[in-house]
Swiss-Prot record:
GO molecular function (one): nucleic acid binding
Subunit annotation: Heterooligomer composed of large and small subunits.
Natural source organism: Streptococcus pyogenes serotype M1
UniProt-recorded name of the protein: Exodeoxyribonuclease 7 large subunit
Family affiliation: Belongs to the XseA family.
Keyword Flavoprotein: no
Catalytic activity: Exonucleolytic cleavage in either 5'- to 3'- or 3'- to 5'-direction to yield nucleoside 5'-phosphates
Length: 446
């Protein structure tokens, strides 16, 4: 009679076979991801091809180290071990390592992170800072032993001697490189003497350049208050640091040129040109002023200053005559009124009427005299004010204060440009005049 096995016994036997079979302990498998839904810890999904499906498990630590995200329909190559799950009698593969089929894991991770950061706006042009035209100190984050720092120093020294280079020695590949780049970007931003940053390294494989594709480096460059120039790898290499930086340079030399857009020679030429323009503008202004002074010195006021107050004297004479005539007319009118009043009073029999008329005459006389005195004082004050203003322009009074007046051929001399050697001049002073001959002429500004 045959012995019948229980389901449990059969399952345990099969599990023992699975666990001890060397071919199932390390399986290399390719398949398409199916039924994938990202979980916060371990990942459970299926791998399938055209004819079969196998369940797959990936522990949280393994998934975290992948460097890329699994997606529904993605074809991957995995390494793992096959195990049997006794309660259900089903088998599955526990994945220990995985990479995309046909494309490197880093390349896929690059594209996925680029897509994510683009959607979050990290690479938008509106976040780019303009580079300064003139710098005094440049921070460089790179390896101290590479050709990058040498090329930058050489180019900056050639284009603008005197600009300082501050090197932040940084590990640029391998474990911890991304963290060092981030730390030095933040250190540089704490300084107040830097104008911009150059972040870069020489060429290499995608693995060598990977520190500059890390999200923490992209975040640090994005948050930098200093403008950042990225110069990572060769011209054909592209990193996420290039996308987020304010400017990307294909080579260290190009980065140094971007950092010094205007050379010292260009600046000196511009300064000389501005100086020449300012000098010519000053000469034109001086010439215009000299022409104005020459023209003014030939005007009637300076050649015949007495004509300046002729009109005022005539006006004063007219006002004086008017005042005198007015006073005479009013006195004459007052006398006539007095005669009429005296005649009327002589014919009056009433003493009270005489006294009333006498009071009116006295009042009228007082008002007349007060009015005449007020007008006389007002006209006299205006006359004296005008006379003082005119006398202040009198050349003889200017000479009396200690100045001298120079004449050539009875014409006033206002500038040395009117005099030549050998000219006969007359110098008028307050107590006499001098007749002199010019022996030399010197042009000097006072």
């Amino acid at each position: 009679m045959a012995d019948y096995l229980t389901v449990t016994h059969l399952t345990k036997y099969l599990k023992l076979k699975f666990d001890r079979d060397p071919y199932l302990e390390r399986v290399y498998l390719t398949g398409q991801v199916s039924n994938f839904r990202k979980r916060p810890t371990h990942q459970y999904f299926s791998l399938k091809d055209e004819s079969a499906v196998i369940q797959a498990t990936m522990w949280a630590g393994v998934y975290k180290k992948l460097g890329f995200d699994l997606e529904e329909g993605m074809k991957i190559n995995v390494i793992g071990r096959v195990q049997l799950y006794e309660p259900s009698g089903s088998y599955s593969i526990v994945i220990e390592k995985a990479e995309p089929d046909g494309i490197g894991a880093l390349a896929l991770q690059f594209e996925q992170l680029k897509k994510k950061l683009t959607a979050e706006g990290y690479f938008e042009q509106k976040h780019k800072q303009p580079l300064p035209q003139f710098v005094s100190k440049i921070g460089v984050i790179t390896s101290p032993s590479g050709a990058v720092i040498r090329d930058i120093i050489t180019t900056v020294s050639r284009r603008f001697p005197g600009v300082e280079i501050l090197l932040f020695p940084t590990k640029v590949q391998g474990d911890g490189a991304a963290q060092e780049v981030v730390a030095n970007i933040r250190r540089a931003n704490q300084r107040e003497d830097l104008d911009l940053l150059i972040v870069g390294r020489g060429g290499g494989s995608i693995e060598d350049l990977w520190a500059f594709n890390e999200e923490i480096v992209v975040q640090a460059i994005f948050e930098s208050q200093l403008p950042v120039i990225s110069s990572v790898g060769h011209e054909t290499d592209t990193t996420l640091a290039d996308f987020v930086a304010d400017r990307r340079a294909a080579t260290p030399t190009a980065a140094a040129e971007l950092a010094t857009p205007i050379t010292k020679t260009d600046l000196m030429s511009w300064i000389v040109e501005r100086q020449n323009r300012s000098y010519q503008a000053c000469l034109r202004r001086i010439k215009q002023r000299q022409e104005w002074v020459d023209k003014l010195s030939q005007s009637v006021i300076f050649r015949q200053p007495e004509r300046l107050y002729d009109a005022y004297l005539q006006k004063i004479d007219r006002l004086s005559m008017t005042l005198m005539n007015t006073m005479k007319d009013r006195l004459s009118s007052a006398k006539e009124n007095k005669v009429q009043l005296d005649h009327a009073l002589a014919n009056s029999q009433l003493q009270t009427k005489i006294e009333r008329y006498q009071d009116r005459v006295a009042t009228a006389k007082r008002l007349l005299m007060a009015n005449m005195a007020s007008q006389y004082d007002s006209q006299l004050a205006r006359f004296e004010k005008a006379q003082d203003a005119l006398l202040s322009l009198d050349a003889s009074r200017i000479i009396a204060r200690g100045y001298a007046m120079i004449e050539k051929n009875q014409a006033l001399v206002a500038s040395v440009s009117q005099i030549t050697k050998g000219d006969q001049l007359t110098i008028k002073m307050r107590d006499g005049q001098l007749d002199v001959e010019v022996k030399d002429v010197k042009n000097e500004n006072i």
